Amino acid sequence: MMDMFFAYLLVASATPLFIWLDNKKVALSAIPPIILMWVFFFFYATESLSPLGHTLMIILFAVNVIVAHIAAFIIYGLPYLRRKRSS
């Protein structure tokens, strides 16, 4: 589980850079959860994360995955559907 979390953390950290030109608001809104995930990862790596902290870390991870998919749909899916509908 932690390997998957760390891999996602690295990808999520770069995501605002990829979407900056398409939607600055979405890119900026992605930064606070990324910072929180790095904080949780630091506590996990130093073995000072409580069971509640583990639970919050997994919840934050799941929420961030869901928000990232919604953002991807808003940025890339909706314009595609609008172009398809108008033609």
From Swiss-Prot:
Induction, as annotated: Repressed by AbrB during growth and activated at the onset of sporulation in a Spo0A-dependent manner.
Localisation: Cell membrane; Spore membrane; Spore outer membrane
Major location (coarse): membrane
Protein name per its UniProtKB record: Spore morphogenesis and germination protein YwcE
Organism the protein comes from: Bacillus subtilis (strain 168)
GO biological processes: spore germination
Residues passing through the membrane, by range: 1-21, 26-46, 56-76
GO (cellular component) term, any one: outer endospore membrane
Function summary: Required for proper spore morphogenesis. Important for spore germination.
Membrane topology value: Multi-pass membrane protein
Signal peptide bounds: none
Stored InterPro entries: Spore_morphogenesis_YwcE
One Pfam family hit: YwcE
